């Protein structure tokens, strides 16, 4: 069995972003039910030197849109990091999902050998399209989605594994 670059990337990222929206929705409902200021969750961290929830969402969405653009050879859209409410974070995630859905398989498939260079603080890092997807994008994306889940769970939001995995009959 083989899997295409498109199948291994955009549908996976869209599902992860959809699940992240669900997780944030549960946190928003929890805040309303318990009469907790939602900004408490938006600013929450697992540890003082770790990034807050809001930054986890910024990075997850930036990773997803950057993946689609780089694999397709397109310009990466810039999103200013200004969202500070659950509604604004939902809108950012939806904008990213809509962007990912604007690509079709033909734009992504065949990108396995595309040269991708990331400008990092430590200097440029070079990848092929396949190594970029498998060794950078997917681990980085899921690290930040998982950390968002962990921050909210640690903050008392009633979340379970199916909230993270997306137990809404999308496994086909």
Predicted features along the sequence, with ranges:
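Short, contiguous alpha-helical
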Residues: 42-76, 125-159
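C-terminal end-helix/capping segment
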Residues: 153-172
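Helix-adjacent hinge/juxtasegments
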Residues: 65-106
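Aromatic-residue-lined binding/catalytic grooves and analogous aromatic/hydrophobic interfacial grooves
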Residues: 3-26, 39, 46-69, 94
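Long, well-ordered alpha-helical segments
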Residues: 20-34, 148, 152
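Acidic interhelical loop/turn segments
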Residues: 31-42, 102-133, 165
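A short, mixed-charge helix-start or loop-turn motif at secondary-structure junctions
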Residues: 2, 78-82, 130
């Amino acid at each position: 069995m083989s899997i295409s670059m498109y199948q291994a990337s955009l549908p996976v990222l869209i599902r992860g972003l959809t699940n992240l929206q669900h997780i944030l929705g549960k946190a928003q409902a929890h805040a309303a039910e318990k009469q907790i200021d939602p900004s408490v969750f938006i600013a929450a961290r697992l540890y003082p030197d770790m990034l807050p929830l809001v930054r986890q969402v910024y990075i997850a969405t930036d990773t997803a849109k950057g993946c689609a653009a780089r694999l397709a050879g397109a310009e990466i859209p810039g999103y200013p990091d200004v969202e500070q409410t659950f509604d604004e974070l939902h809108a950012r995630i939806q904008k990213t999902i809509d962007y990912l859905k604007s690509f079709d398989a033909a734009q992504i498939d065949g990108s396995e050998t595309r040269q991708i260079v990331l400008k990092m603080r430590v200097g440029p890092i070079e990848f092929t399209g396949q190594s970029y997807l498998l060794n950078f994008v997917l681990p980085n994306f899921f690290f930040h989605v998982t950390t968002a889940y962990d921050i909210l769970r640690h903050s008392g939001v009633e979340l379970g594994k199916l909230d993270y995995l997306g137990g809404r009959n999308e496994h086909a």
